[in-house]
């Protein structure tokens, strides 16, 4: 007996279809319009200003208005955290939606615009009465953080010459043989990828405390895993472009090999993100020196080797298998949930600040900070990935201290995974997927310094892949129907020298492609899963679409852009290996995860806004721990599969 099953969009706690989610409140679009009216002034000097509401109780505004308007708000600089926390609380504590709008209008006139947008995003995502409301993504509010200065100057010139709704072509890829990293500009400077990084930090604010709402389940682990995946994806892109994998940042006193020129300017304020020439050395800041950073790292590693962290009162907190990675994530990020911020410090965030101020650490020259200072721009810089590989290696130290999974733990006796085939929707080939360039329209609204009273369109080019599906051949020998969780990963097969990767090097490069639930009938089953259904990604509509068309969506869309699901590959084809693992849903699902309709997309990287992460397994399972033996074949159990997949870049450009 065999059956064909089509896998559905899922949450491990409960399988949820869109038609099972409660309807979005009828007033959602009205609420969106009120929010759009508020933020229509942000970063738009030519939008007519409204007067500040009068008569508000000034005592409730104490501590707000400290960060100057012309500065960039940095979530990495903890000196801004008290004000950012106060701003978010001010909006979160509003008694109803009308009160929320009143408070937001007051706040907008009082605090730094960049900070206001962050606080507003956090509040809208987490308030009960704004569920279903989709605030415009950060790249719609600040195009100047995502488009280079010369593009926006061209837009302004066309507007100044009287063009209505001008169109600027930003798709031409300039060759720069002097900077090898320029080959990666399609990835580093991708609008959706950088917007994803910002939005992840909105869903999981470093300043979040339990008093603001439910504790963020596994937030520290999600911090580790999402950034680990970003680094793994970056390394895959480097190998696709015949570049070696990025080296971790190691020595605070070594010159940095990478320079970076962002060519980004905030037109309203004139803020110009700093250029960093190669060869600079990270220097002490007035408020923090490099020795403190070394000390924080040493204390964290000491805790890993002892398998404990020390709380502020001196209590030992075990870094056990279940919660250890989560505790470490909160301490390393660090967030306000760290068990002991005074002792373990803020190593991740302050490294961003040090890198951003590398050319003017004490401010004597009045330079603006570099892109590493800003959550919305930091992932553009190659140094971001060197730094996060350094952070990743600290987490790896902890993971390598854990016992490897045993064959007993890995095996699902009821199931045999026979084969997996990757089938493109067009073409007569299997286990091969083609990538290419795609051109989309990035729409700029009215009121910016460069658009004035008209709208404008910038044509941008991004990577894309052909649609495909997985065909999974699997036997269920339990004698009754069983639910399976399928976990799908991809990694390059060969290193930069053309040699097979050692298994523990390769597992560090595994990127998650999907995680889903399907029912296995007794006997033989063939499961189909579409690439577009990935639990990792968000639709490109959230990057290039119209916000009003998304107002009735149940998605919070914190995920990876769907068009970057696969790495670029090579013209001649590049061999990757696909890893698929089937595990028992009954063991994996979380009973009290709740029906999370609001954020049923992007669950793998982003988790849940207010419920438990609906998967009992560690993120990245079963490749999150070291593998003993010489290869995957020794590790593999009957419920696992691996095989070669070729990704070929065609070089074609498709315009929509």
Swiss-Prot record:
Q: Which positions does UniProt annotate for Cu cation B binding?
A: 348, 352, 388
Task: Give me the Gene Ontology terms describing cellular component.
Answer: extracellular region
Q: How does it assemble?
A: 36-chain polymer consisting of 6 hexamers, each of which includes 4 different chains, A, B, C and D.
Spell out the subcellular localization from the entry: Secreted, Extracellular space
Matches recorded under InterPro entries: Di-copper_centre_dom_sf, Hemocyanin/hexamerin, Hemocyanin/hexamerin_mid_dom, Hemocyanin_C, Hemocyanin_C_sf, Hemocyanin_N, Hemocyanin_N_sf, Ig_E-set
The UniProt entry, under Pfam families, shows: Hemocyanin_C, Hemocyanin_M, Hemocyanin_N
What lineage does the source organism belong to?
Answer: Eukaryota, Metazoa, Ecdysozoa, Arthropoda, Myriapoda
For the ligand (Cu cation A), the binding residues are 197, 201, 227
The cross-references to Gene3D superfamilies, in alphabetical order and at most eight, read: Di-copper center containing domain from catechol oxidase (1.10.1280.10), Hemocyanin, C-terminal domain (2.60.40.1520), Hemocyanin, N-terminal domain (1.20.1370.10)
What this chain does, per the entry, is described as: Hemocyanins are copper-containing oxygen carriers occurring freely dissolved in the hemolymph of many mollusks and arthropods.
Q: Which organism is it from?
A: Scutigera coleoptrata
Protein's UniProt name: Hemocyanin subunit A
Could you tell me which cysteines form disulfide bridges? Answer: 558-606
Residues annotated as glycosylated = 313
Q: Residue span of the signal peptide, if any? A: 1-18
The keyword Disulfide bond is annotated on this UniProt entry:
yes
Q: What family is reported?
A: Belongs to the tyrosinase family. Hemocyanin subfamily.
* Alphabetic keyword roster: Copper, Disulfide bond, Glycoprotein, Metal-binding, Oxygen transport, Secreted, Signal, Transport
Task: Give the PANTHER family listed for this entry.
Answer: FAT-BODY PROTEIN 1-RELATED (PTHR11511:SF5), LARVAL STORAGE PROTEIN/PHENOLOXIDASE (PTHR11511)
User: Which GO MF terms are attached to this record?
Assistant: metal ion binding; oxidoreductase activity; oxygen carrier activity
Tissue specificity, in the record's words, reads: Hemolymph.
């Amino acid at each position: 007996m065999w059956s064909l099953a089509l896998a559905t969009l899922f949450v491990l706690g409960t399988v949820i279809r869109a038609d099972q989610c409660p309807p979005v409140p009828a007033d959602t679009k009205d609420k969106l319009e009120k929010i759009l009216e508020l933020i229509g002034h942000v970063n738009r000097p030519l939008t007519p200003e409204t007067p500040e509401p009068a008569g508000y109780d000034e005592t409730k505004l104490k501590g707000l208005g400290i960060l100057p308007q012309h500065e960039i708000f940095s979530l990495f600089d903890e000196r801004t955290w008290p004000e950012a926390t106060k701003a978010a609380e001010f909006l979160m504590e509003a008694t109803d939606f009308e009160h929320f709008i009143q408070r937001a209008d007051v706040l907008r006139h009082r605090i730094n615009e960049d900070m206001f947008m962050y606080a507003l995003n956090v509040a809208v995502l987490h308030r009960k009465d704004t569920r279903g409301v989709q605030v415009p993504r950060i790249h719609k509010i600040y195009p100047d953080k995502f488009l280079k200065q010369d593009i926006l100057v061209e837009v302004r010139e066309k507007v100044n010459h009287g063009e209505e709704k001008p169109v600027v072509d930003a798709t031409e890829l300039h060759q720069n043989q002097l900077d090898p990293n320029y080959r990666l500009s399609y990835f580093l400077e991708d609008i959706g990828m950088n917007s994803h990084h910002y939005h992840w930090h909105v869903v999981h604010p470093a300043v979040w405390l339990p008093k603001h709402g439910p504790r963020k389940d596994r937030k520290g682990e999600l911090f580790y895993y999402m950034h680990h995946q970003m680094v793994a994806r970056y390394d895959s892109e480097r190998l696709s472009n015949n570049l070696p994998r990025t080296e971790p940042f190691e020595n605070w006193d070594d010159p940095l090999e990478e320079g970076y020129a962002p060519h980004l300017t905030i037109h309203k304020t004139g803020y110009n993100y700093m250029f960093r020439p190669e060869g600079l050395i990270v220097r002490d800041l007035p408020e923090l020196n490099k020795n403190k950073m070394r000390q924080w790292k040493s204390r964290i590693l000491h805790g890993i080797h002892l398998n404990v962290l020390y709380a502020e009162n001196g209590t030992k907190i075990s870094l056990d298998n279940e919660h250890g990675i989560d505790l470490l994530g909160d301490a390393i990020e660090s967030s306000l949930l760290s068990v002991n911020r005074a002792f373990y410090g803020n190593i991740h965030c302050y490294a961003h600040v040090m890198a951003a101020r590398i050319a003017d650490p004490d401010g004597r020259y009045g330079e603006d900070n570099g892109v590493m200072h800003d959550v919305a721009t930091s992932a553009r810089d190659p140094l971001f990935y060197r730094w996060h590989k350094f952070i990743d290696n600290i987490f790896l130290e902890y993971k390598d201290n854990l016992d490897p999974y045993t064959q007993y733990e890995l095996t699902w006796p009821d199931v045999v995974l026979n084969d997996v085939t990757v089938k493109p929707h067009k073409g007569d080939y299997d286990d091969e997927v083609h990538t290419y360039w795609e051109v989309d329209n990035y729409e700029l609204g009215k009121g910016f310094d460069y658009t004035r009273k008209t709208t404008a369109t910038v044509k941008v080019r991004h990577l894309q892949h052909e649609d495909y599906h997985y065909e999974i051949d699997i036997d269920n020998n339990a004698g009754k129907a069983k639910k399976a969780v399928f976990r799908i990963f991809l990694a390059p097969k060969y290193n930069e020298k053309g040699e097979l990767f050692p298994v523990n090097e390769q597992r560090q490069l595994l990127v998650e492609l999907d995680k889903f639930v399907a029912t296995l009938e007794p006997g033989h089953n063939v499961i189909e899963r579409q690439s577009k259904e990935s639990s990792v990604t968000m639709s490109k509509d959230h990057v290039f679409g119209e916000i009003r068309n998304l107002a009735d969506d149940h998605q919070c869309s914190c995920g990876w852009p769907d068009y970057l699901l696969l790495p670029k590959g090579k013209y001649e084809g590049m061999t990757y290996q696909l890893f698929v693992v089937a595990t028992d849903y009954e063991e994996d699902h979380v009973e009290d995860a709740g029906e999370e309709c609001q954020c049923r997309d992007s669950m793998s990287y982003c988790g849940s806004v207010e419920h438990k992460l609906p998967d009992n397994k560690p993120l990245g399972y079963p490749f999150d721990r070291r593998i003993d033996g010489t290869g995957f074949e020794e590790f593999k159990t009957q419920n696992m599969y691996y095989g070669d997949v070729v990704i070929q870049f065609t070089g074609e450009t498709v315009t929509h």
